[in-house]
Design a protein with these regions (language model features):
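N-terminal beta1-alpha1 ligand-phosphate binding loop
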Residues: 2-29
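Short histidine/acidic/glycine/proline-rich micro-motifs that form metal-
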Residues: 10-13, 94-99, 124-130
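Residues at alpha-helix caps and immediate loop-helix transition turns in enzyme cores, especially N-
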Residues: 18, 69, 103, 133-136
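Glycine-rich phosphate/pyrophosphate-binding loop and the adjoining helix
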Residues: 23, 27-29, 45, 117-150
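Short helix-capping segments at alpha-helix termini
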Residues: 26-33, 82-84
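A short beta-strand-loop structural module common to alpha/beta enzyme folds
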Residues: 32-43
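Helix-loop-strand module that forms the ligand-binding subsite of alpha/beta enzymes
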Residues: 41-118
């Protein structure tokens, strides 16, 4: 069975709502043969990454940067996972109250360094999430999970 790892930092109600929408898409009844594993960024390990076939990453934009929790996750897994996870599919969502472009640049720089393959349209949002944003997150989760279906 394929495994999708969702690594997230959800300190706010907005991030929690987006996370729940991503999970709803990834665990949709039409998705078969994919185990969805959820880990808070500070709890996710290199073993989690190595055992997964694809990744979804969620972070708030804090003062123009990704959350310290997600950065810590990347710092922890980078070298142990660098060679073993090349080419694996990933997607991401970012939420902030203002500019999120720095956060996206950081996340893409790290995932490029890992040689992960972006496999779904990212979701970036500012302000309170609306229905369109939540639907985009559901689509993100479903798309990544469907990518892993055998």
């Amino acid at each position: 069975m394929a495994r999708l790892l969702i690594v997230h930092h959800t300190p706010s109600p907005s991030m929690q709502a987006l996370f729940e929408a991503v999970v709803a898409g990834a665990t949709h009844p039409d998705i078969e043969g994919v185990e969805v594993v959820r880990r808070a960024a500070l709890a996710a390990t290199a073993t989690d990454v190595l055992e997964a076939d694809g990744y979804l990453l969620g972070t708030p934009a804090n003062l123009g940067s990704m959350s310290g929790a997600l950065k810590h996750f990347f710092d922890t897994i980078y070298y142990p996972c660098l060679d073993e996870t090349r080419g694996r599919p990933f997607g991401y969502w970012i939420h902030g109250n203002s500019d999120i472009s720095g956060t996206e640049r950081q996340l893409l720089a790290i995932t490029t360094g890992l040689a992960w393959a972006k496999a779904a349209e990212s979701v970036t949002a500012t302000g309170d999430p609306d229905r369109k944003t939540l639907e985009a997150c559901t689509e993100l989760g479903g798309t990544l999970a469907a990518t892993l279906m055998a």
